[in-house]
Structures are given as structure tokens and as C-alpha cells.
């Protein structure tokens, strides 16, 4: 459950290390983002020489949440951290690698490039 001012780790090699959520996209009064939702965020920490710099405003898709997600069969999937992948306007990732596992729910949200780059899909 990601809301405004939530901090997330970045799960790709775009150069950002930490994001701060500015807005949850999709609806006028939407408060929370879950796995597969798009957020607008600012880069709070970045590595030198990366594609994105500290202070950049970017779009990102949530790939891991501590609160988790409920599956249609009744099971839940939860992770140890909140993480996101920085994306372009056409929903393709800015980086070329994805770190850590991602949830299967991204496949339903048409983020197939992220799913194919991920080392593990849970």
C-alpha cells in the first residue's frame, strides 16, 4: 500500500536508488497504489553516472510491497520491502536490468518487458 510521501527502493539499474512518491495515478482522489500501479515520484538518492539524477520527477510502476496482494485463489504474496521500477511514457523500463523478484500481477497490467527482464516472477 503505497501512498503520497512513501519511499520506495528502485529495482533497476537506471541510476536511482530511492524514490519519494508524489502522486498515485489513476483516478482523481486515489490514495493508495498496489503492485502493478503507476506512481509519479521524485528521485531522492541516485548513483553517479546514472540515467536519472537526484531531483528528477519520474514515473514508476510498483513491483513489490510489504502489504502484499491477494490472489484470486485466496493466497497472498508479500515482500520484505517496497520497490518500484522507473518507466518511460510507453510503459517500458528506463533501465536495462531488474533486480530482485517481481509479482505475477505485473503480467496482468501489461508490463511484459519488466516481467521478462526480472530474474524471478513470484
UniProtKB/Swiss-Prot annotation:
Q: Which Pfam families match?
A: Ribosomal_L14
GO terms, biological process = translation
NCBIfam families on file: rplN_bact
The family annotation for this protein states: Belongs to the universal ribosomal protein uL14 family.
Gene Ontology CC annotation, any one = cytosolic large ribosomal subunit
Q: Report the protein name in the record.
A: Large ribosomal subunit protein uL14
What is the native source organism of this protein? Bacillus mycoides (strain KBAB4) (Bacillus weihenstephanensis)
Designated gene of the protein: rplN
Gene3D superfamilies per the UniProt record, alphabetical: Ribosomal protein L14
Classify the source by domain of life: Bacteria
- Subunit-level organization: Part of the 50S ribosomal subunit. Forms a cluster with proteins L3 and L19. In the 70S ribosome, L14 and L19 interact and together make contacts with the 16S rRNA in bridges B5 and B8.
Amino acid at each position: 500500500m503505497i501512498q503520497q510521501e512513501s519511499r520506495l527502493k528502485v529495482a533497476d539499474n537506471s541510476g536511482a536508488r530511492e524514490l519519494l512518491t508524489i502522486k498515485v495515478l489513476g483516478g482523481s482522489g486515489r490514495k493508495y497504489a498496489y503492485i502493478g500501479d503507476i506512481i509519479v515520484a521524485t528521485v531522492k538518492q541516485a548513483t553517479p553516472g546514472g540515467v536519472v539524477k537526484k531531483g528528477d520527477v519520474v514515473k514508476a510502476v510498483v513491483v513489490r510491497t510489504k502489504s502484499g496482494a491477494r490472489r484470486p485463489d485466496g493466497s497472498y504474496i508479500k515482500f520484505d520491502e517496497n520497490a518500484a521500477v522507473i518507466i518511460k511514457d510507453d510503459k517500458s523500463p528506463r533501465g536495462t536490468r531488474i533486480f530482485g523478484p517481481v509479482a505475477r500481477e505485473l503480467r496482468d497490467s501489461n508490463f511484459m518487458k519488466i516481467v521478462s527482464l526480472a530474474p524471478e516472477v513470484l
